[in-house]
Every structure is written in structure tokens, then in C-alpha cells.
Amino acid sequence: MGLLGELLLLPAAPLRGTAWVLRQVVAEAERQYYDPAAVQRELARLNELLEAGEIDEEEFDRREDELLDRLEKGPRQS
């Protein structure tokens, strides 16, 4: 795209920049959310809560399934 095209698209630059920033934020959030080390830490904490009696077996199973699903699925591929 030449100089003329760049000049015509200049008013949309803030929107393109905002969209790029949002894509970067989403990618980083997914990376942290699906990080196996973070999921393992949450599983360990969940086990501690169960052993301390702060949650019951049903709650433990539900939350454990959610965490294991996160490990299996991983971040969405784009």
C-alpha cells in the first residue's frame, strides 16, 4: 500500500492500535490462565482446602474437573 493508502487509513490508526493491544492482552491472559504450573499450584491449593475441611468432596471434584479441563484444552489456537 502506498503513501496515499496510508494517508487514507490514518484516521483508523487508533482503532487498529487498540485492536492490536486487545489481542496482545487476550493472548497473555490465556497464556497465564492455561499455564500448567499455575494450574498445578491451584490443584495443590484445592487439595489443601479439602484436607483442611474448608470445602467438601463434591466441591473439590467440581473444581478439580474444571482445572483438569484447563490443562487438557490449553489456549485456543488462532
From Swiss-Prot:
Q: Which Pfam families match?
A: GvpG
Q: Where primarily located?
A: other
Q: Transmembrane segments in this chain: where?
A: none
Q: Which domain of life is it from?
A: Bacteria
Record's keyword terms, sorted? Gas vesicle
Q: Does the keyword Calcium apply?
A: no
> Where located?
Gas vesicle
Gene induction: Gas vesicle production is induced by growth conditions that promote production of secondary metabolites tiancimycin A and B.
Give yes or no: UniProt keyword Chaperone.
no
Which cellular component, as a GO term, is one annotated location?
gas vesicle
Query: What is the role of the protein in this entry?
Result: Might be a minor component of the gas vesicle involved in nucleating their formation. Gas vesicles are hollow, gas filled proteinaceous nanostructures found in some microorganisms. It is not clear what function gas vesicles perform in soil bacteria.
Q: Which family does it belong to?
A: Belongs to the gas vesicle GvpG family.
Q: What else is known?
A: This strain probably produces some gas vesicles from the probable gvpO-gvpA-gvpF-gvpG-gvpJ-gvpL-gvpS-gvpK operon; it can be induced to produce more under certain growth conditions.
What is the protein name given in its UniProt record? Gas vesicle protein G
**Organism from which the protein derives:** Streptomyces sp. (strain CB03234)
